């Protein structure tokens, strides 16, 4: 199972770095920061499906 540490989030601004992650919502997030901010917003219901595009 792929895991990612989001303990340092949310962050007010994310970089434009492109390292796609696929969330359990079948949405592709452009990088860890965008994904982790979404995890925080989801109250932990969003998890990482896999690294790379969905």
Curated annotation (Swiss-Prot):
Q: Does the keyword Disulfide bond apply?
A: yes
Q: Which organism is it from?
A: Spheniscus humboldti (Humboldt penguin)
What is the protein's given name?
Answer: Ovomucoid
- Disulfide links within the chain: 6-36, 14-33, 22-54
What the entry lists under SMART domains is as follows: KAZAL (SM00280)
Concerning PROSITE patterns, the annotation shows: KAZAL_1, KAZAL_2
Q: Where is this site: Reactive bond 3?
A: 16-17
User: What Pfam families does this protein map onto?
Assistant: Kazal_1 (PF00050)
